[in-house]
Swiss-Prot record:
It is found in: Secreted; Host cytoplasm. Pfam families: Nis1. This is Necrosis-inducing secreted protein 1. Glycans are attached at residues 38, 61, 130. One of its GO terms (cellular component) is host cell cytoplasm.
Length: 137
């Protein structure tokens, strides 16, 4: 019985966090596509608030330009009563992202900047995920 109580105590403090993102290899300008946000269980309270979506040149040095998302193409609210989507405790959720009609065709990094708050200390920040996409006519 003690083991069950301990397990439930830890489980109640666990929360999901976004740990990766994926998208189709080819996307069409002026059209929406579905990007996938993948989540896992985290041992502390963890809130992902939203994702800023961007397209950047494929040669963007993300180590030298920490926090850069390139051209902002969208935002997805993940928090509260008016969230655009609900991130599951562990799994995947699809998010609609639209490529601007005036985006030049070519290869880009699709970058997702996910804002978060974690733990009792209230640490905030962003996690960044990227994948290469080909923008087509």
């Amino acid at each position: 019985m003690q083991l069950l109580a301990t397990t439930l105590t830890f489980a109640s403090g666990a929360a999901a966090y976004i740990n990766s993102m994926s998208a189709p290899a080819s996307v069409q300008r002026g059209q929406a596509f579905t990007a996938q946000l993948n989540s896992s269980i985290y041992v502390q309270n963890y809130d992902d608030f939203g994702v800023v979506w961007g397209l950047a040149p494929p040669n963007l040095n993300t180590s030298a330009c920490v926090g850069c998302v390139g051209r902002r193409i969208g935002y997805t609210n993940l928090f509260g009563d008016k969230a655009d989507v609900q991130v599951p405790p562990s799994g995947t959720v699809g998010v609609q992202v639209t490529v601007p009609a005036d985006q030049a065709p070519g290869e880009y990094l699709l970058i997702a900047g996910a804002s978060y708050l974690v733990g009792a200390s209230g640490v905030t920040g962003f996690n960044y995920f990227n994948t290469t996409v080909q923008v087509c006519e």
